[in-house]
């Protein structure tokens, strides 16, 4: 009996797209189609990855292409296409340029892969996932933005390093938009099951240091851009996308913070915003509504309003 492998299409063959292609093949999550509008780049990266298969120990197929038709009947699609942030540039500066790219991508998903589960990575994330949703006509449960998983990973890493403990013992997540107004929920963070607030009371870390970590988390992407001088983060964004993809393909039902479509949850309607969701074989299977205190609610509302303004300024 022949086992039909999943088909995973990656739209954009830049740094994140290339890293994603390598990770998908190494994990043998499915056959890969690496798409980019620039001739030669997806073909070259796909060939490079394919040539590593004898020593990498994977047997899935990977092709590079400039034809949208090759993404036909994909099981899952991850979108990283668009221009990347440069030093001094905010995610919002990317808005109009990348919105046009997302419109084209969305229209082709609608044409060739209307049943795929789609993960959007392109910035400014919360607005871009709205554009893809609009032009792809995908059901709201089958499209999601990758942001909260990455922001939460940064938050967890910074806490672990400061406490000098394993990152695996740190549980924390971030709500809201993927930008300066994101809301790392300190009250919900825990260390090996012990609330972070108690860890502060024990004197293992100060509130001031936690506040610094929150600020660093908000500026996590900018910090890497400033260090690289050219380009932006790609290993952590790619890893975060794979985490979400695996939960869908393997029906793991992981609870992950993602930019998802809200239709009344959290008092928000018709907007993609970062909240915890369950991802399984049916895509976004449930939105979890976390109760917030007054301060957290105020920050969340500010983040929601920032995303609303961003979406409103789209000229499509």
Swiss-Prot record:
Belongs to the LDH/MDH superfamily. MDH type 3 family. This is Malate dehydrogenase. The keyword DNA damage does not apply. Pfam families: Ldh_1_C, Ldh_1_N. Keywords: NAD, Oxidoreductase, Tricarboxylic acid cycle. It comes from Wolbachia sp. subsp. Brugia malayi (strain TRS). Its EC number is 1.1.1.37. NAD(+) binds at residues 12-17, 36, 98, 121-123. One of its GO terms (molecular function) is L-malate dehydrogenase (NAD+) activity. GO terms for biological process: lactate metabolic process; tricarboxylic acid cycle. InterPro entries: L-lactate/malate_DH, Lactate/malate_DH_C, Lactate/malate_DH_N, Lactate_DH/Glyco_Ohase_4_C, Malate_DH_type3, NAD(P)-bd_dom_sf. It catalyses: (S)-malate + NAD(+) = oxaloacetate + NADH + H(+). It is an enzyme of class 1 (oxidoreductase). Catalyzes the reversible oxidation of malate to oxaloacetate. The active site is at residue 178. Substrate binds at residues 85, 91, 123, 154.
């Amino acid at each position: 009996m022949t086992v039909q492998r999943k088909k995973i299409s990656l739209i954009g063959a830049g740094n994140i797209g290339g890293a994603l292609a390598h990770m998908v093949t190494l994990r043998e999550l499915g056959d890969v189609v690496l798409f980019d509008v620039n001739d030669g780049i997806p073909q070259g990266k796909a060939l490079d990855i394919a040539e590593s298969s004898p020593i990498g120990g994977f047997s899935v197929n990977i092709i590079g292409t400039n034809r949208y038709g090759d993404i036909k009947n994909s099981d899952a699609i991850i979108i990283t296409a668009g221009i990347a942030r440069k030093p001094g540039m905010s995610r919002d500066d990317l808005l109009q340029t990348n919105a046009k790219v997302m419109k084209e991508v969305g229209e082709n998903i609608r044409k060739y892969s209307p049943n795929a589960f789609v993960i959007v990575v392109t910035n400014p994330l919360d607005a871009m996932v709205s554009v893809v949703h609009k032009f792809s006509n995908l059901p709201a449960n089958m499209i999601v933005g990758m942001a909260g998983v990455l922001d939460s990973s940064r938050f967890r890493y910074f806490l672990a390093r400061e406490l000098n403990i394993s990152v695996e013992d740190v549980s924390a997540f971030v709500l809201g938009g993927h930008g300066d107004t994101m809301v790392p929920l300190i009250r919900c963070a825990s260390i090996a099951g012990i609330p972070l607030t108690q860890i502060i009371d024990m004197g293992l870390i100060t509130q001031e240091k936690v506040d610094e970590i929150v600020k660093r988390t908000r500026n996590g992407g900018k910090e890497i851009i400033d260090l690289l001088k050219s380009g932006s983060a790609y290993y952590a964004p790619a890893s975060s996308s794979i985490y979400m993809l695996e939960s869908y393909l393997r029906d793991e039902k992981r609870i992950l913070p993602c930019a998802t479509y809200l239709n009344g949850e959290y008092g928000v309607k018709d907007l993609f915003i970062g909240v915890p969701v369950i991802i399984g074989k049916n895509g976004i299977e449930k939105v979890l509504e976390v109760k917030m205190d007054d301060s957290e609610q105020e920050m969340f509302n500010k983040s929601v309003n920032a995303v609303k303004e961003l979406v409103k300024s789209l000229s499509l």
